[in-house]
């Protein structure tokens, strides 16, 4: 089963070329037993997402690039427009959607959450989930302070910013840590819940 993944956008100045890319960590992640039933399908921003929707069973909005709302550059704007379409089609077609770091921020922003600059979210830190806590990686300059009314928190950081959430009614989850990087799978309960929504 294919899981579509949005990609980071970069500009290679020496070649005057805009590029889509995914970290090699994503390939390593899909080699793990947890992902053995799935194959990643990188999504191109030059191909309308409606073309992909019949090929995939779920979508991951990956990390990289700040939202254009906070970093108004051409690449961020292009990515925001595409991922907005992805969210809307996933809602229409009931396609399970997972946001990772920037992807979680994109979903949170779409559903009217409050996002602001943060400090001390680089490296690793404690995450509080129900009555448990675990260590996760952390690589973001913006944090979700308050969720929109359609979203519910699942995990918090020590500063009470949102580390994970889900939609109250739709098949949508957001995680602020990078599942593909070191300390990304120290707690997989939320990931397993999202997997349970994916139908063959």
Curated annotation (Swiss-Prot):
InterPro entries in the record: Class_I_gatase-like, GATASE, GCDPHdlase, PuuD-like
Recorded metabolic or biological pathway in which this protein acts: Capsule biogenesis; capsule polysaccharide biosynthesis
Catalytic reaction equation(s): N(5)-(cytidine 5'-diphosphoramidyl)-L-glutamine + H2O = cytidine 5'-diphosphoramidate + L-glutamate + H(+)
SUPFAM superfamilies: Class I glutamine amidotransferase-like
GO terms, biological process: capsule polysaccharide biosynthetic process
EC code(s) of this entry: 3.5.1.129
Gene3D superfamilies named in the record: 3.40.50.880
GO MF assignments: hydrolase activity, acting on carbon-nitrogen (but not peptide) bonds, in linear amides
Active site positions: 101, 178, 180
Entry keywords, A to Z: Capsule biogenesis/degradation, Hydrolase
Phenotype when the gene is knocked out: Mutant does not express the MeOPN CPS modification.
Domain (Glutamine amidotransferase type-1): residue spans on this chain: 20-200
Enzymatic class: hydrolase
Pfam families per the UniProt record, alphabetical: GATase
GO CC terms, sorted: cytosol
Keyword flag Hydrolase: yes
Keyword Kinase: no
Record's function text: Involved in the biosynthesis of the O-methyl phosphoramidate (MeOPN) group found on the capsular polysaccharide (CPS) of C.jejuni. Catalyzes the hydrolysis of CDP-L-glutamine to L-glutamate and cytidine diphosphoramidate.
Protein name: Gamma-glutamyl-CDP-amidate hydrolase
UniProt organism field: Campylobacter jejuni subsp. jejuni serotype O:2 (strain ATCC 700819 / NCTC 11168)
